[in-house]
Amino acid sequence: MDFQQLADVAEKWCSNTPFELIATEETERRMDFYADPGVSFYVLCPDNGCGDNFHVWSESEDCLPFLQLAQDYISSCGKKTLHEVLEKVFKSFRPLLGLPDADDDAFEEYSADVEEEEPEADHPQMGVSQQ
């Protein structure tokens, strides 16, 4: 996929997230993204026909630790698309953006109807002597 097509994918992705594509550099194949409050990162796109993966990084010390999830994902087996990489970055930055963690939402919905049962008093608990 040529760089302009990748930039189009990035623009479309931005329309569904708080991020803006603030700069593109075709010679470096770099795209810079920004969202309030000061969340920024960039993506280096692999050359056509090259075996390299995408690379994500941030020049912000506050943002960099949150990118670990996305970096691990990119380095895992299999080719990733730009959209997949950007989605993983968005998920990584949700806490910085003040958004709930997507996984937490699913877990809360699933466990919301579960009622805790009180242990019955007439059954002895294991390991507790009855005297």
UniProtKB/Swiss-Prot annotation:
It is found in: Cytoplasm. Keywords: Cytoplasm, Developmental protein, Phosphoprotein. One of its GO terms (biological process) is positive regulation of megakaryocyte differentiation. InterPro entries: Maturin. It comes from the Eukaryota. Residues 107-131 are annotated as: Disordered. Phosphorylation at Tyr-34 is essential for its ability to promote megakaryocyte differentiation. Induction: Up-regulated by NF-kappa-B RELA/p65. Up-regulated during 12-O-tetradecanoyl phorbol-acetate (TPA)-induced megakaryocytic differentiation of K562 and HEL cells. GO terms for cellular component: cytoplasm. Residues 107-120 have a biased composition (Acidic residues). The modification Phosphotyrosine is found at Y34. It holds the Pfam family DUF4581. Belongs to the MTURN family. Promotes megakaryocyte differentiation by enhancing ERK and JNK signaling as well as up-regulating RUNX1 and FLI1 expression. Represses NF-kappa-B transcriptional activity by inhibiting phosphorylation of RELA at 'Ser-536'. May be involved in early neuronal development. This is Maturin. The gene is MTURN.
